[in-house]
Design a protein with these regions (language model features):
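Class I SAM-dependent methyltransferase SAM/SAH-binding core
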Residues: 46-48, 52-102
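A short SAM/SAH-binding and catalytic strip from SAM-dependent methyltransferases
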Residues: 112-124
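Short alpha-helix
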Residues: 170-184
């Protein structure tokens, strides 16, 4: 197995090490977001918070797009390059590190811009959405899949999301996400609010090849057996608060530049 950078025992550090990223709704929500954004063959798409490159690969292979992916994690970008090379799509994708609140791109560069479970973790969500709008061409769509409180949560659930998923900034409800998109100058803003669904979540695995899944399991097991800090991390986060997903869901938010 190719040696990877030393693992950070953090929510994103673990994902980068194992080679897996996820968002609520899995591949089913990715496909729905693509359809809502009208993404199709020949389009140049920006995938903000691209993680290990699973959505980028899907856009290239299933929709004939060119994709630029950006992520703040060097470990994620390393895995994304590995995936692109393994799947023979390295000529259709570009991956680089960067900050969603200050994107390293010219204005009006992309036909569409998407973000899946990324802005949830960003301090200034309004500024980030404004950046997504800035780099999107006129008439292009900006699409988000982001965690959303379905109703005001009790304190214990806010604490759990902060401690488990390292969501350091308050999650908004649906109306706030939409208002930020309007403030960024996006038009025809629409949203679809979704509750946790185990069947839909099961489509996470379809974002990966069987070899990827095997490597993820091997890396996870190796980390669990060899790293006491990781074992403590898992133990402390094993139990979900009762009724969490009565409160926590996600929304698909789309607006036109």
């Amino acid at each position: 197995m190719k040696k990877h950078s030393p693992v950070e025992i953090t929510y994103f550090g673990i994902q980068a090490y194992t080679g897996t990223t996820k968002h609520m709704g899995g591949l089913a929500s990715t496909q729905e977001l693509i359809e809502l954004c009208g993404i199709g063959e020949g389009m140049h798409v920006l995938d903000v918070g691209c993680g290990v490159g699973a959505t980028a690969a899907f856009l290239v292979q299933q929709h004939g797009c060119r994709v630029t992916g950006i992520d703040r994690s060097e470990g994620m970008i390393e895995r994304a390059h590995q995936r692109a090379n393994a799947e023979g799509i390295q000529d259709q994708v570009v991956f680089k590190t960067g900050d969603v609140q200050d994107l390293p791109f010219a204005a009006e560069e992309f036909d569409a811009t998407i973000s899946e479970s990324v802005l949830t973790f960003v301090a200034d969500k309004a500024a980030a959405i404004a950046e997504l709008a800035r780099v999107t061409k006129p008439g292009g769509q900006v699409g988000l899949n982001e965690e959303t409180w379905l109703k005001p949560p009790p304190t214990e659930m806010i604490t759990y999301t902060h401690n488990t998923w390292q969501i350091e900034h308050d999650l908004p409800e649906s109306g706030k996400w939409q208002s930020w998109m309007v403030a960024a100058g996006l038009r025809d803003v629409r949203s679809k609010l979704l509750a946790f669904d185990s069947t839909r979540e099961g489509t996470q695995v379809f974002r990966y090849r069987w070899r990827d899944m095997w490597l993820m399991m091997v890396r996870s097991l190796d980390l669990y057996l060899s790293n006491s800090e990781f074992r403590k991390y898992v133990k402390a986060r094993r139990r979900l608060p009762k009724g969490l997903f009565d409160y926590l869901g996600y929304g698909l938010y789309v607006g036109r530049k």
